[in-house]
Design a protein with these regions (language model features):
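Residue position within the beta-strands of beta-propeller blades
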Residues: 1, 49-52, 94-97, 149-152
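Alpha-helix-centered segments that form part of catalytic cores
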Residues: 44-45, 49-53, 167
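Residue-level signal for tight coil/turn positions that link beta-strands
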Residues: 9, 38, 45-46, 90-91, ...
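Surface-exposed loop/turn elements that mediate protein-protein interactions on large endomembrane-trafficking
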Residues: 2-27, 56-77, 103-132, 157-187
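C-terminal regulatory/effector modules of DNA-binding transcriptional regulators
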Residues: 95, 141-142, 150, 167-169, ...
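Extracellular, repeat-based ectodomains that mediate carbohydrate processing or recognition
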Residues: 84, 89, 98-99, 113, ...
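Repeated scaffold domains used in trafficking and secretory/extracellular systems
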Residues: 25-43, 78-90, 133-145, 185-194
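Generic beta-strand structural signal
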Residues: 5-7, 43, 53, 65, ...
């Protein structure tokens, strides 16, 4: 259930604008069903945003901050779970699957992880970055100035020796030019850009 904490009264209130709602059924605007599992809630320019998964598709949804309305903004990419992370910048959202193909038993060299840009005004989507290879995921994306930084995480296990192969590469995507480049392959597990 989507709840609001009133700082002044310290009361927790369901985010539902229905006057007679008892907040105990699926008709309540504050109810988030299982299609929203694992999806963090984001607040951007007066609206709430969340990702739901329906019919094998991750969908970006905008919710009025008082809970009075919901609207689908964009179909992001195929997904069977709610492991989609979002970064907002300049009235767009950049979405990626933070689990990807990491540690997948059947991951292949042709598997691809992507970052998809969705324009919040019209829902238009475009793939702005892709990385191909087995056992990879995109992690820790953050916006710094005019660039989106993120990690490519490779995580696999050798079935015969049972040894793990874990490494990270830092990339950046330039919002203005639409180009991405490798910043470091020195196995960086966390970062900050100043």
């Amino acid at each position: 259930m989507l709840m609001y904490l009133d700082d002044s009264t310290h009361k927790i209130i369901p985010v539902c604008a229905k006057a007679e709602c008892k907040h105990n059924s699926s008709d309540c605007n504050a109810v988030l069903d299982s299609s929203y599992d694992n999806s963090p809630l984001h607040y951007y320019k007066g609206s709430l945003y969340v990702v739901k998964v329906e019919g094998g598709m991750a969908k970006l949804e905008r919710i009025a901050k008082d809970g009075s309305s919901r609207e689908d903004v964009a179909d992001l990419f195929a997904s069977d779970d709610g492991t989609v992370s979002l970064v907002f910048h300049d009235d767009c959202v950049y979405a990626y699957d933070r689990i990807g193909h990491m540690g997948a038993v059947e991951s292949k060299d042709t598997d691809k992880v992507v970052i998809v840009k969705a324009e919040l005004a019209n829902g238009k989507t475009s793939e702005v970055f892709s990385y191909e290879g087995a056992n990879n995921a995109i992690n820790e994306a953050r916006s710094f100035g005019d660039k989106l930084f993120f990690l490519i995480n490779h995580n696999s296990i050798d079935k015969e020796t049972l040894t793990a192969d874990v490494n990270y590469k830092l990339y950046c995507y330039d919002y203005a030019t639409g180009s991405a480049e490798l910043v470091s392959d020195k196995n960086i597990s966390d970062y900050y850009v100043d």
